[in-house]
Amino acid sequence: MARPDGIDAVFAACDAMALGALDAFAASDLMVPRDIGVMGFDDLLAGRFSRPPLTSIGPDPAEAGAALVEAVLGADAEKRRRVPVSLVARASTARM
């Protein structure tokens, strides 16, 4: 598979999808991150051990857990809560 023109990177909705993209690109002889970057969301443990290790956006576990408990217990069900996230930069992306 040739890299589509103008596409430098893929941002997947979750790390599981990003890991699938890593596999697909490897099977297509595209080198990550030389030919295309890959990034996921949720910072799964598996991303640390993929080849190359997956760059991800990771939510703060304590804040995410607290938000989940509040939602399950029905505490102010109409309230939206933002959970802080951070970039976990690994080798699946390169600086442009």
Residues covered by each model-derived region:
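Flexible loop/turn connectors
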Residues: 2-96
